[in-house]
Swiss-Prot record:
GH18 domain: residues covered: 23-433
Matching Pfam families: Glyco_hydro_18 (PF00704)
GO biological process, one term: chitin catabolic process
Domain of life: Eukaryota
Name listed for the protein in its UniProt record: Chitinase-like protein EN03
Cellular component terms (Gene Ontology): extracellular region
Source organism (scientific name): Bombyx mori
Keywords associated with the record: Disulfide bond, Glycoprotein, Secreted, Signal
Protein's gene: EN03
Family matches, as InterPro entries: Chitinase_II/V-like_cat (IPR011583), Chitinase_insertion_sf (IPR029070), Glyco_hydro18_cat (IPR001223), Glycoside_hydrolase_SF (IPR017853), Glycosyl_Hydrlase_18 (IPR050314), IDGF (IPR015520)
GO molecular function: chitin binding; chitinase activity
Cystine pairings recorded for this chain: 27-54, 337-418
Signal peptide feature range: 1-16
Length: 433
């Protein structure tokens, strides 16, 4: 009898305590890394050391066929052909990691063919139906646990660096109005809400299938996302609060690409806290919100010598490609760490970069090399490292958010080239949650 009373008491206590929620760690794998060369080439088997830290693995990216609006593989030879069969190679990882949820991610800026089709699809019930039917079939056929909509909406235009006359003309245009980025904003907002609702309806008899939304960077959620209408239909919303400054968007100025809070005298909306706050104040439960850390590092040339690299700085455009990813203006984390000064090198020794951390833990990390006496060789790079990823995870925990996303694993140090530890950025984010 005493045992029964004790059990009843424990049950009552358990009900009184708040439910324990487990933070999500969304790990994106960009399949385009499969065709890179040498140390940058990432195969499905390279994911193994990461998956014990991930709750979700998102395979990117599926794309929209322009003429039919069906969801198809970005690279059928890689994803579906029996030689590689990446789709099945990825979903088969669940056998070793039974708690892992594997989703197929759509768009993600990988779909470069006729990008206007993303808006056109939203305007047509028939197109949405074709997308949904083909998407659900594709996910089921290859064993995915659902779909992530990384929808390619039009982007907010970057700030331009203007001359005096240019600034005057810009002021005149603002006074009399300018052409909006998207002339059918309301229709596309309603269309995306309908897409989410209809896709959720198609999955309603498949209870294990999940549906997520990824907000790509520089997409204006106040325009395209009807938060109250979609938030209860999705398992998470992954907020992409990064890429505010890149060599592509701002080829004459460099700054922190993914600050948590607003640096002084900057756009108050270009930071993680502002992006998250919009969703929370619009009615999203905090546990539905996931914050992204993107591992792309942006390299620019022509750092101003007189300010010792302190951003924002004027630049001459993207820096030269690194030895692994081989993309102008973009570095992976191993390419960054290989350029940094280490204790065995003399301070300031060229061609290495000096790392500058942020003591406030609010803005991010950068590294730089001043120009030489001829004004050449200056470099400035904004990047995510284990410290900044950990700071974002700590922010997520302090706000009781749903988790973090790593975009993407191929740009982490998945070979352990920096210190010998594989996936140091992913690990740091996971440990701080």
């Amino acid at each position: 009898m005493k045992l029964f009373i004790a059990l009843v008491g424990l049950l009552a206590l358990a009900k009184a305590l708040p439910a324990v929620t487990h933070s999500k760690v969304l790990c994106y794998y960009d399949s385009r890394s499969y065709v890179r060369e040498s140390q940058a080439r990432m195969l499905p088997l390279d994911l193994d050391p990461a998956l014990s830290f991930c709750t979700h693995l998102l395979y990117g990216y599926a794309v929209i066929q322009p003429d039919t609006y069906k969801l198809v593989s970005l690279n059928e030879n890689l994803d579906i052909d029996r030689t590689h069969d990446n789709y099945r190679a990825i979903t088969s990882l669940k056998a070793k990691y039974p708690g892992l949820t594997v989703l197929l991610s759509v768009g993600g800026d990988a779909d470069t063919e006729e990008p206007e089709k993303y808006n056109l699809l939203l305007e047509s019930q028939q197109a949405r139906t074709a997308f949904i039917n083909s998407g659900v079939l594709l996910a089921e056929q290859y064993g995915f646990d659902g779909i992530d909509l990384a929808w390619q909406f039009p982007r907010v235009k970057p700030k331009k660096i203007r001359s005096t006359w240019g600034s005057l003309w810009h002021g005149i245009k603002k006074t009399f109005g300018t052409t909006p980025v998207d002339e059918k904003e309301s229709e596309h907002r309603e269309g995306f809400t309908a897409l989410v609702r209809e896709l959720k309806q198609a999955l309603i008899h498949k209870p294990k299938m999940q549906l997520g939304v990824t907000v790509l960077p520089n997409v204006n959620s106040t325009i395209y996302h009807d938060v109250p209408a979609i938030i209860n239909l999705v398992d998470y919303v992954n907020v992409g609060a990064y890429d505010y400054y890149t060599p592509t968007r701002n080829n004459k100025e460099a700054d922190y690409t993914a600050p948590i809070y607003t640096p002084q005298n900057r756009n108050p909306l270009q930071n993680a806290d502002a992006a998250v706050t919009y969703w929370l104040t619009s009615g999203a439960p905090s546990q539905k919100i996931v914050l992204s850390x993107r591992l792309r590092s942006y390299l620019e040339t022509g750092x101003d010598s007189e300010i010792a690299g302190v951003p924002p700085i004027h630049t001459d455009g993207p820096g030269e490609a690194g030895p692994y990813v081989k993309t102008e203006g973009l570095l992976s984390y191993p390419e960054v760490c290989g350029k940094l000064i280490n204790p065995n090198q003399q301070k300031g020794m060229r061609p290495h970069l000096r790392k500058v951390t942020d003591p406030s833990k609010r803005f991010g990390t950068y590294a730089f090399r001043l120009p030489d006496d001829n004004g050449e060789g200056g470099i400035w790079v904004s990047y995510e490292d284990p410290d900044t990823a950990g700071q974002k995870a700590a922010y997520v925990k302090s706000k009781n958010l749903g988790g973090v996303a790593i975009v993407d694993l191929s740009l982490d140090d998945f070979r352990g080239l920096c210190t010998g530890d594989k996936y140091p950025i992913l690990r740091a984010a996971k440990y701080r949650l």
